[in-house]
Amino acid sequence: FPVQIFKVKEGVNFNPGDPNYDLFQLALKTSAQRLFPNFSFIDAPFNLQYYRPGDYNTEVAYMGCRTRVMGNVYDPTKEVTCGRGNLSFTSINLPRLGIEAHGDIDKFFKSLDDMIDLVIRQLMHRFKIQCSKVVRNYPFLMGQGIWIDSEKLNINDQVGEVLKNGTLSVGFIGLAETLVALTGKHH
């Protein structure tokens, strides 16, 4: 950290002839050697549905851990990047599940389903604890109006209504190693 996010957009830097195509090529070369920067493809179908030309708030954002912040289940009218963030994340250790499955794909997916359920319960528990905190527990984020609607709160108000605009993430690690554990080879 800090992590650099390189935004890619047709007409800006994606295609040969775009004004900043050379910068995109340099970013690709750098990423091939250093694994950074990360890339945000604004025109990808799952991002483009939120994008409104000229409104940077509607350009999808990624956190340092590559968590995508855009969709808002709580309030779809606030599907923007500014004033929001990822509240908590948990990564599932896929190789462990693969090793424990001893090559049994059905057992692996059953274990994965169970683990996802556990992680969701864990994230919701953590969210409940975070929501019980008050503005003074987050003096910068809430006290300075950084989060959406936090300027409406007083110093001793709970922050739950504001945090509902955030995200909770389930991630995974070790996909290639999991394939080796289950099938003997990876991609």
What is the meaning of each model-derived region?
Residues 1-165, 185-187:
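Conserved catalytic cores of very large enzyme subunits
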